[in-house]
């Protein structure tokens, strides 16, 4: 039976009396106009259907069959996925990646693992997340989520670019440390600070010159004291100022005997007075740092603190020796003065105290520390070369009457200065065989020294650039904060996340 050009087919019984149960969909008329004539072609299809169904009690009405072209074929029931099994499409500058939501949710603190963070990049029209970032790098970023926290840099991605991607996707400090370790970078030492507020202030004051203006002032004073101490150490050796404290035999008329006395006492020496002033500052600085340090064990492991201790020991040793000499016989005073001169020589190590306030010396020390293996190989190669060539030159010159090489140990000095390309000329071979040995020794020395030098230079460049980057990073936060505050004050807007349809909206607060 045809009604209005429609064929009969079975449809489920629908209650059209309640029009609220019919959902609005684009392209379908849902406005039931009661004023429309019954069966009028211009009326709504649903209103006409309502009339036809109400007039017949049989379910197989004229409107109960529709053409097969307009009916969707029956299919399987839809499977409702839980949140963890949902697929997520990530578009990286046009290259689409697909993963599951539970894979990203393993790391909720990251950009992709945090829903609110990643929703800022959601494209509701395409139902995907779009990032205008480096495409090859995302292979390593996605592998981090899939592997449960293993970071691997793709071979075709530079180190600095991949490091920027790790920072952008907020993978965290552990991922960055793992990446730097895999790439062969040396891990930065952790900075320990005292828990006590007063101790922390004094520790920063004396240990970190860049922490405040007062710390920089203390650093300037320390440098001046070190310079004065080194200057005094050098000036007192001049002939017009030198005081060797030579012993003089003086006859005592009262006792009718002779005794040995010093030409000048140490306590009347102006250099000793200046030295005492410097030692007071060094001791005060060392004791204060030891009291407020966060770890007493680490304090004695620090090479700089050991240098500070060694630099003040000669003064107290000299003071004790001077006091003891007043009661010791003259025979032991000569030995005491010899020991005293050796102890005073240790004062030269005070020059290393400047490295505490010099970034260049610190970089040099870190380079030597990181290159200990290469330096050990260099010394080992030199040792082999010295033994080999000193033996060869001895046997080449053994029959020469005027030879400088009377034994193999005498040839050690010649081999060292030749392999290091110094060549003093105080010892030289005279026979043709000895000259051939000398030529081979010089060539071997050049090759031995040149091999580890590139590694040492590479370590120096690494520490130098790392220190430069750290200084730049210290200046960046303040500049960024200033720019953000300036922009925020001009725009007067704050960004808020609108979770409707996965979008992100901006609410502007106008004053």
Swiss-Prot record:
Detected in kidney, in proximal tubules, glomerular endothelium, in vascular endothelium and in smooth muscle cells. It is a multi-pass membrane protein. Residues 22-50, 489-511 are annotated as: Disordered. One of its GO terms (molecular function) is delayed rectifier potassium channel activity. GO terms for biological process: action potential; potassium ion transmembrane transport; potassium ion transport; protein homooligomerization. Voltage-gated potassium ion channel that mediates K(+) permeability of excitable membranes. When opened in response to the voltage difference across the membrane, KCNA10 channel selectively allows the flow of potassium ions across the membrane down their electrochemical gradient. Homotetramer. Interacts with KCN4B/POMP. Interaction with KCN4B/POMP is necessary for the modulation of channel activity by cAMP. This is Potassium voltage-gated channel subfamily A member 10.
């Amino acid at each position: 039976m045809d009604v209005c050009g429609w064929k009969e087919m079975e449809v489920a019984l629908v209650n059209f009396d309640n029009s609220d149960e019919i959902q609005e969909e684009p392209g379908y008329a849902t406005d039931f106009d009661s004023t429309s004539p019954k069966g009028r072609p211009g009326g709504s299809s649903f209103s006409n259907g309502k009339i036809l169904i109400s007039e017949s009690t049989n379910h197989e009405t004229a409107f109960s069959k529709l053409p097969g072209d307009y009916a969707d074929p029956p299919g399987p029931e839809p499977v409702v996925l839980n949140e963890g099994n949902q697929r997520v499409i990530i578009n990286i500058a046009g290259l689409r990646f697909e993963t599951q939501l539970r894979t990203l949710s393993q790391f909720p603190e990251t950009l992709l693992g945090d829903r609110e963070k990643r929703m800022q990049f959601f494209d509701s029209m395409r139902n995907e997340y779009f990032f205008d970032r480096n495409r090859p790098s995302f292979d390593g970023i996605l592998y981090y989520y899939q592997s449960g926290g293993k970071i691997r840099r793709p071979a075709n991605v530079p180190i600095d670019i991949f490091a920027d991607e790790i920072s952008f996707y907020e993978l965290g400090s552990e991922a960055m440390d793992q990446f730097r370790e895999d790439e062969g970078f040396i891990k930065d030492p952790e900075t320990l600070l005292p828990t006590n507020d007063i101790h922390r202030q004094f520790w920063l004051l004396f240990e970190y010159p860049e922490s405040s203006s007062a710390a920089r002032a203390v650093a300037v004073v320390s440098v001046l004291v070190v310079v004065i101490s080194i200057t005094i150490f050098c000036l007192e050796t001049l002939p017009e100022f030198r005081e060797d404290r030579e012993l003089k035999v003086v006859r005592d008329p009262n006792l009718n005997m002779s005794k040995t006395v010093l030409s000048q006492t140490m306590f009347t020496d102006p250099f000793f007075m200046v030295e005492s002033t410097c030692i007071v500052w060094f001791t005060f600085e060392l004791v204060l740092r030891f009291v407020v340090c966060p770890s007493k064990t680490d304090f004695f492991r620090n090479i700089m603190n050991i240098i500070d201790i060694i630099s003040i020991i000669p003064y107290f040793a000299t003071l004790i020796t001077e006091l003891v000499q007043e009661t010791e016989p003259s025979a032991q005073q000569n030995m005491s003065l010899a020991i005293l001169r050796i102890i005073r020589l240790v004062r030269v190590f005070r020059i290393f105290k400047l490295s505490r306030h010099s970034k260049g010396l610190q970089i040099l020390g870190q380079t030597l520390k990181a290159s200990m293996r290469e330096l050990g190989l260099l010394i080992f190669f030199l040792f082999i070369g010295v033994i080999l060539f000193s033996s060869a030159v001895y046997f080449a010159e053994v029959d020469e009457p005027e030879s400088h090489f009377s034994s193999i140990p005498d040839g050690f000095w010649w081999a060292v200065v030749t392999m290091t390309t110094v060549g003093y000329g105080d010892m030289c071979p005279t026979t043709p065989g000895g000259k051939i040995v000398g030529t081979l020794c010089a060539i071997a020395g050049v090759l031995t020294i040149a091999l580890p030098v590139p590694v040492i230079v590479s370590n120096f460049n690494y520490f130098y650039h790392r220190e430069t980057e750290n200084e730049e990073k210290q200046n960046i936060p303040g500049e960024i904060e200033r720019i953000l505050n300036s922009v925020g004050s001009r725009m007067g807007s704050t960004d808020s996340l609108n979770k409707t349809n996965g979008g992100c909206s901006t609410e502007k607060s106008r004053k």
